[in-house]
Swiss-Prot record:
Residues 208-227 have a biased composition (Basic and acidic residues). Coiled coil: none annotated. One of the essential components for the initiation of protein synthesis. Protects formylmethionyl-tRNA from spontaneous hydrolysis and promotes its binding to the 30S ribosomal subunits. Also involved in the hydrolysis of GTP during the formation of the 70S ribosomal complex. This is Translation initiation factor IF-2. Residues 576-578 are annotated as: G5.
Length: 930
């Protein structure tokens, strides 16, 4: 709290500035003006001084109780009858520290003189107050000392306001006598006096009533007239005044106050007993115990009586001051004492996230209600579900809105979208090296070309060459670096395309000059086109005598690959892997293509990339080859790749060297993943391991569900379920044949099958057995594989079973065409055909109490069936279409009535007339044929 001035402090506490300055000087503070600053420490000193002056500084206990317990044994009896008895003695003593102990001798002497004067004054007041309770004693049959003592106590109570008034006029111990506190003290004293007077008046009324009842009860036993009873009452008056003359009344006062000090209250009837009770008890008991107590009280010393009385008076005044101060504090803090908690009066609305499916127990937990109550609400909606069953999103939304909460629809892919949004990289873009994939037929020199590039550009001058198993490496040219990916079988490339990742920037298509375009070459062209990646054609083996580059160029033109010399956009380079002819030109063409693409990446950001391949090495664990596309991958980063995650424990480059970080377009091997990721999976760097674990688990569950749903995705019978309504349906096929002639014949025949609604789309065709590449391509495009006189090997069959791809084998071309045509026919919408099965004429109409109007009919054609739809014709015009409600023959329900028989027909929700025709028909769906 900031410092305040003396004037501000006086205003806040409601005291005059002059008195506050005087008190501060008495407390030892050096403040003389109203503008002087007062710190928090000085406020505490002033408060401590004021508390000390008011007698509140000492907070130590003023009463102590000591307890002692001793156990002894005594022997009782004589002779053989002796026995030992344990005797336990318990003693308890209480010591009370008086206020007078802290007063010095001088003040004690002065207080003694004042006490004597006050005692005499109080005794006189007590003697004067005695006549107010005379009617109470007047009805007593026998005067006794005990009632006299109690009457003196009542008079002392009435004299309490006088004592308080006398005490306030005397000099007090407090040095802080503010006008406000004096007014409050006076008000408290006035209220106490009024309360005492009211209690005395009520007590007098009650005593008068009780005396009247006692007089009525004792009147039959009276032996003297009423004046004699009055004389007896007069005779009791001197007895009542006798204890006052002997100054025994002050002895009774501290007895009552001693009870008050021990917690019995300031009111005499606090425990349910009053003076009349004591009078009755003493009258019944006689002069035995009551007289003894009166004698003991009368025998008390005079001086101690006066001291006890003054102690009582001082305590009362001190209690009044304490009450005044407490009331002042309560009034000062009344506004700040409000409870901070407010009971909510409006309904609390929660926002509930609802996924596509949610368990009943989980929804109840989010709604903060009991599961039983939620199940009751579901039953009211017609949904029978237990606490562990899943309900759909729409039902959960209805429940949430019915309870008055807000529902937030959550998609299953929200976690992926949130992850992508949190991984958005922003920074300065820099030029990166191109990523090149070499593809082609295995016999066309692809491996020799890669070996020559590595030996000439990477391993020249290094002992041992490079590590072959990494499958990726970088080459430095005059125009920069180039990253090569070696992906045998192109499995990773297909997986990348399936996930929409463009890990490859340029494809080098290797074609042998002496062999021409082969099926694998066509497959590579289709892969490149599917990924929308530019192609650079490398015509290899140009050093051979049988090389014919022109023939290769013409064959590629026939496949849609147009060279720049023919007006296309594809670069053609003639190379030789043995002599090195055209290698530099090939690298130059790649660099030129990269410049056209303007490849850039962010360097100073979290790393992103793609997994090229993964394996498990003994002693090293999971080893994954990754290609960094964005950012910088560092050792120790937490990466998430598909369903696997972990920290990078080590990184190895293409030379087998340990590296600490890898930038964009850099392939490295990493160690530390918990399981091998799939080839083509994207990887990202995260900061939160818990989030990585959650995303990995979500992806694993999602893949499991997709595999369950994918078993029907590629089946011929369910192919139409994947097509969108209103669009031309397509049957996607991958064809493999034994010879090129058969393949061309099959392609031409399939192209002729189809119409405006369905068609066949051949995405890939080739010669030879069915390979894993074909299966991967079919998985990506949702196609079926057709093999003509070819088969799939064991690994391919296992992959097809795992991915749920349908492979069909044929040896006769007509069977292949018929099944494809049947599949296309199954994709066509069926045709609905109506057939009339029976006609009945209405000849009479009857009224039935159960069915209403019933038509008596004669079946004139076909058969009338009970459960088939009908039409009612009147004058050969259809006036009603519906169904039969009942069909009877001779009061018996029947399912059908044949031609020439009579029957009763009840038409549901319609009235028929005589002469109408009832036409029974059925609707059949007829499959359409191409």
């Amino acid at each position: 709290m900031a410092e305040v001035t003396v004037n501000e402090l006086a205003t806040s506490i409601g005291a005059p500035v002059e008195r506050l300055l005087k008190q501060m000087q008495e407390a030892g503070l050096q403040h003389k003006t109203a503008s002087a600053k007062v710190s928090d420490e000085e406020k505490q000193r002033l408060l401590a001084y004021l508390k000390g002056s008011h007698g509140e500084a000492a907070v130590e206990p003023r009463k102590i109780t000591l307890q002692r317990k001793t156990t002894t044994t005594i022997k009782t009896g004589t002779g053989n009858a002796k026995k030992t008895v344990n005797v336990e003695v318990r003693k308890k003593r209480t010591y009370v520290k008086r206020e007078d102990d802290v007063v010095d001798n001088t003040q004690a002497a002065q207080s003694q003189e004042q006490d004597d004067e006050l005692a005499s004054t109080v005794v006189e007041e007590v003697q004067q107050a005695e006549p107010s309770v005379v009617p109470v004693v007047d009805v007593a049959p026998e005067p006794e000392p005990e009632p006299v003592v109690e009457e003196v106590d009542v008079a002392a109570e009435e004299a309490e306001p006088v004592e308080a008034a006398v005490d306030t006029s005397a000099p007090t111990r407090f040095s802080f006598t503010d006008g406000i506190e004096e007014k409050r003290r006076a008000a408290i004293e006035r209220r106490q006096a009024e309360e005492a007077a009211r209690q005395a008046e009520l007590k007098a009324i009650e005593e008068a009533k009780r005396a009247a009842e006692e007089a009525k009860r004792t009147q039959p036993r009276a032996e003297k007239p009423a004046d004699k009873s009055a004389a007896a009452g007069k005779g009791a008056k001197p007895d009542n005044r006798q204890p006052a003359k002997g100054k025994q009344a002050p002895v009774a006062v501290p007895v009552e106050r001693e009870d008050a000090k021990h917690g019995h209250g300031h009111k005499k009837h606090h425990h349910g007993r009053n003076d009349d009770d004591f009078d009755d008890d003493s009258a019944d008991r006689g002069n035995k115990r009551g007289a003894g107590k009166a004698v003991k009280k009368a025998a008390a010393p005079k001086k101690s009586s006066k001291i006890d009385l003054l102690d009582f008076v001082g305590d009362d005044s001190e209690d009044s001051d304490v009450l005044a101060r407490r009331s002042h504090i309560r009034a000062h803090h009344k506004k700040n004492n409000k409870h901070a908690f407010k009971k909510p009066t409006t309904q609390i609305v929660h926002e509930i996230d609802i996924p596509e499916t949610i368990a009943v127990s989980e929804l109840a937990q989010r709604l903060t209600i009991k599961v039983g109550e939620l199940i009751k609400r579901l039953m009211k909606m017609g949904v029978m579900a237990s606490m562990n069953e899943q309900i759909d999103q729409d039902t959960a939304v209805l429940i949430v809105e019915e309870l008055g909460h807000k529902a937030n629809l959550v998609s299953e892919n929200d976690i992926e979208h949130a992850l992508e949004k949190s991984l958005e990289t922003a920074g300065e873009l820099t030029t990166r090296a191109p990523v090149v994939t070499v593809m082609g037929h295995v016999d066309h020199g692809k491996t020799s070309l890669l070996d020559y590039i590595r030996e000439a550009k990477v391993a020249a001058g290094e002992a041992g060459g490079i590590t072959q198993h990494i499958g990726a490496y970088r080459v430095t040219t005059s125009r920069g670096e180039i990253t090569f990916l070696d992906t045998p079988g192109h499995a990773a490339f297909t997986a990348m395309r399936a996930r929409g990742a463009k890990a490859t920037d340029v494809v080098i298509l290797v074609v042998a000059a002496d062999d021409g375009v082969m099926p694998q070459t066509e497959e590579a062209i289709m892969h490149a086109r599917a990924a929308e990646v530019p192609i650079v054609v490398a015509i290899n083996k140009c050093d051979k005598p049988s090389a014919d580059p022109d023939r290769v160029t013409n064959e590629l033109v026939a496949k849609g690959v147009i060279p720049e010399a023919y007006g296309g956009d594809t670069q053609f380079v003639q190379v030789s892997a043995h002599t090195g002819q055209g290698i530099d030109e090939l690298l130059e063409a790649i660099s030129l293509q990269a410049e056209v693409l303007e490849l850039t990446a962010v360097t100073n950001a979290a790393a992103k990339g793609v997994v090229i391949e993964a394996r498990v090495d003994k002693g090293r664990g999971t080893v994954a080859t990754v290609l960094v596309q964005q950012g910088t991958l560092k050792q120790g980063d937490l990466i998430l790749a598909g369903q696997s995650y972990g920290r990078v424990r080590a990184m190895v480059n293409e030379r087998g060297e340990q590296v600490k970080e890898a930038g964009p377009s850099t392939p490295v091997e990493i160690l530390g993943l918990d399981m091998p990721p799939s080839a083509g999976d994207d990887f990202v760097v995260l900061d939160d391991e818990r989030k990585a674990r959650e995303v990995a688990a979500f992806r694993a569950e999602k893949e499991r569900k997709e595999k369950l749903a994918r078993f029907q995705a590629a089946k011929l019978e369910n192919m139409f379920s994947n097509m969108e309504a209103g669009q031309k349906k397509t049957l996607t096929v991958v064809i493999k044949a034994d010879v090129r002639g058969s393949l061309e014949a099959i392609q031409a025949s399939l192209a002729d099958i189809g119409n405006d609604e369905v068609q066949v789309n051949v995405i890939s065709s080739g010669i030879g057995g069915i390979t894993e590449n074909d299966v991967n391509l079919a998985v990506t495009s949702g196609a079926i594989i057709v093999g003509f006189n070819v088969r799939a090997d064991g690994a391919t069959r296992r992959l097809a079973e795992t991915e749920g791809v349908d492979i069909r084998y044929y040896s006769i071309i007509y069977q292949l065409l018929d099944e494809v045509k049947a599949a296309l026919s199954g994709m066509l919408d069926p045709e609905r055909v109506e057939t009339i099965v029976g006609i009945a004429n209405v000849r009479e109409v009857f009224n039935s109490p159960k069915f209403g109007q019933v038509a008596g009919c004669m079946v004139v054609e076909g058969t009338v069936y009970r459960n088939k739809p009908i039409r009612v014709l009147r004058d050969n015009v259809v006036i009603f279409t519906g169904e039969l409600e009942s069909l009877r023959r001779f009061k018996d329900d029947v399912n059908e009535v044949r031609n020439g028989f009579e029957c009763g027909i009840g038409v549901k929700n319609y009235d028929v007339k005589v002469g109408d025709q009832i036409e029974v028909y059925e609707v059949k769906e007829v499959a359409r044929q191409l």
